[in-house]
């Protein structure tokens, strides 16, 4: 199963659109780096986080070499937040995975090192093509 590494912006956007639970039904293994869960998802309640984990969101504790890589990214790309760098390091450590982000700086840097990157609209397309939602439902969700 292909892995999708999430940054927080896409999880928040999918939640606001009411599509986060449906996204976790897609045939991908969804992951988030542990530091993001502890710092950037503060607008999610503990119960919401536990529910997402129960639905299949894997929280990955980065090994020391990935933490080191994130710090290297942070030094090389000061426009990226440390959380962006954790996401990029996690994605880089798993060849063939997808990085899901809405952050243009992160998209550009990740693409430049060979990571496949998509955003929320790609998830909407996946939901529609898999029958988990319709185009009309997705557009109504984003309009609200």
How would you name each of these model-derived features?
Residues 4, 9, 14, 63-64, ...:
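Non-catalytic interface/targeting segments
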Residues 5, 14-66, 122:
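PIN/NYN-family metal-dependent endoribonuclease catalytic core
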Residues 6-9, 34, 101-103:
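Short His-Asn-centered micro-motif
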Residues 34, 46-48, 107-144:
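Acidic, PIN/NYN-like endoribonuclease modules and their adjacent C-terminal/linker elements
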Residues 98-101, 118-119:
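Short hydrophobic alpha-helical runs that function as membrane-insertion/retention elements
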Residues 1-3, 28-30, 93-98:
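Short active-site oxyanion
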Residues 67-78:
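Glycine-rich phosphate-binding "P-loop"
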Residues 81-98, 105-106, 141-144:
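Acidic, metal-associated active-site segment
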């Amino acid at each position: 199963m292909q892995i999708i590494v999430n940054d927080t912006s896409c999880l928040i956007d999918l939640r606001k659109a009411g599509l986060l639970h449906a996204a976790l039904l897609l045939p991908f293994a969804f992951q988030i780096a542990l530091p993001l869960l502890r710092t950037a998802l503060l607008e999610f309640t503990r119960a919401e986080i536990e529910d997402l984990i129960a639905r299949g969101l894997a929280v990955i504790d980065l090994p020391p070499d990935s933490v080191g890589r994130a710090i290297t990214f942070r030094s090389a790309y000061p426009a990226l937040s440390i959380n962006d760098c954790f996401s990029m390091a996690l994605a880089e450590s798993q060849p063939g995975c997808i990085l899901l982000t809405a952050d243009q700086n992160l998209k550009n840097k990740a693409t430049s090192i060979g990571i496949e990157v998509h955003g929320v609209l790609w998830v909407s397309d996946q939901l529609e093509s898999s029958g988990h939602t319709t185009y009309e439902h997705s557009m109504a969700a984003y309009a609200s």
